[in-house]
A protein has these predicted regions:
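A small-molecule sensor/coupling module
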Residues: 2, 17-22, 85-86, 102-134
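Regulatory nucleotide-sensing modules
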Residues: 3, 7-61, 68-70
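Short histidine-centered beta-strand/loop micro-motifs
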Residues: 36-43, 77-79, 88-90
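Short hydrophobic-aromatic micro-motifs
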Residues: 50-51, 74, 97-99
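Short beta-alpha junctions and helix-cap segments that line functional grooves
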Residues: 61, 74-77, 84-86
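A short, polar/proline- and glycine-enriched secondary-structure boundary/capping micro-motif
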Residues: 68-69, 77-78, 108-112
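Ligand-binding loop in jelly-roll beta-barrel domains
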Residues: 80-103
Length: 134
């Protein structure tokens, strides 16, 4: 993953150049097709996912409860807390995703501690919005 491209993604935009280069080493970029189930409700969460391009629906009990697009992040609550996915997320268009595993975040947390704080704030906001997936 290219550090310059990471800087264009809102989650990473405030990181220093050094931190961006560190994250770029560990971030995995994946392309998926429309209809692909990105996460399954009830599965254990081991990574956070950032939508770089495309859109997805969050599905809970068979109902679409939210739509996600570029810049949106999901999976970080379950990943940080070691919990299970709280909803299915399904691609509604071709997508490009950036993922970071729990283990990768542990390895780079000194470089990106300010970003982890931002994730904690995001989590607090999600606690107030049950439509957001973990």
């Amino acid at each position: 993953m290219d550090a310059d491209h990471l800087k264009t993604i809102p989650l990473f935009s405030s990181l220093s150049e050094k931190a961006l280069r560190t994250v770029a080493v560990f971030a995995a970029e994946t392309s998926v097709s429309k209809g692909k189930r990105l996460v399954h409700e009830g599965d254990y969460a081991y990574d956070l996912i950032v939508i770089d391009e495309g859109t997805a629906d969050v599905i809970k009990d068979g109902q679409v409860v939210a739509s996600l697009g570029p810049g949106d992040v999901f999976g970080e609550i379950g990943m940080l807390e070691g919990g299970k996915r709280t909803a299915d997320v399904v691609a509604t268009s071709p997508m490009r995703l950036v993922t970071l595993s729990k283990w990768d975040l542990k390895r780079i947390e000194n470089e990106v501690s300010e970003q982890l704080e931002a994730l904690a704030k995001e989590r607090a906001e999600r606690d107030r919005d049950p439509a957001r997936p973990s």
